[in-house]
Amino acid sequence: MLKPDYGSIKINSKDVSNFPIYKRTLKFKIGFVPQNGGFFQDLTVLENLKAISEITIANVAIREEKINSLISKFELDALLRIKANHLSGGQKKRLVIALSLISDPKVLLLDEPFAALDILTIKNLQKIIVELQSIQGISIILCDHQARDLLACVDTAVIINNGKVVANGTPSEIIDDIDAKRTYFGDSFKII
C-alpha cells in the first residue's frame, strides 16, 4: 500500500504508484485487512462498524442496511456491545474483514490472515475468503507464511523468496513444484 522502492503499482493498467494511499484505496475500491489492528480498540464492535460506515456511506438507510448485513454475515450479533480490544483473535479478524467490506471493495488485501488463529477459526476464515471470491466476486490478494492454510482457499498462488517469484500456479501445481518445496524446506530438501 506504500510507494514502492522500485517498480510500479498498476490497477487496471493505470500506474497509481504516486497516488496517495487514500486515493488508491477509495478510487480503486481496495479493502485492506492488516495482520494486527485495523479497528478502534476502545470502541465496541457496533461503534466500529458505525464509525467506518459513516466515513464511506452517505445515505443513512444504506449505511444501516450494510451494517446489519455485515453483522449477520460475520456472526457479530453477540459481540456488538463488546469493546474491540476485548475480542479473541478470530473475533477481531472477523470484525476487521467486516470493516474492510463496508466500502464494497473490488479487491481485498489480507496480510497474514491466519496468524495466531486456532484451526477452527482458520477453517471458518478460509470459508469466508472463498465466499467473498466466488459469491461476491471480490479479488483477494493475501500473503501468509502458512502455505497450507493459504492454498486451501485460493485458485492461484505465487511463492516469493527474497523478492523473486519462485513458483506460480494453482495450489496443486505449487504443491508439486520442487522450487517451492526448496523455498520452504531449504536446499537440503530431497525427493524420496
Predicted regions and their residues:
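Catalytic Walker B motif of ABC-type/P-loop ATPase nucleotide-binding domains
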Residues: 108-112
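Conserved ABC ATPase "signature" region
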Residues: 61-79, 127-130
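Conserved ABC ATPase signature
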Residues: 83-87
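Q-loop/switch helix immediately C-terminal to the Walker
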Residues: 36, 43-54
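Conserved catalytic motifs of ABC-family nucleotide-binding domains
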Residues: 104
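Conserved ABC transporter NBD signature motif
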Residues: 7-18, 25-28
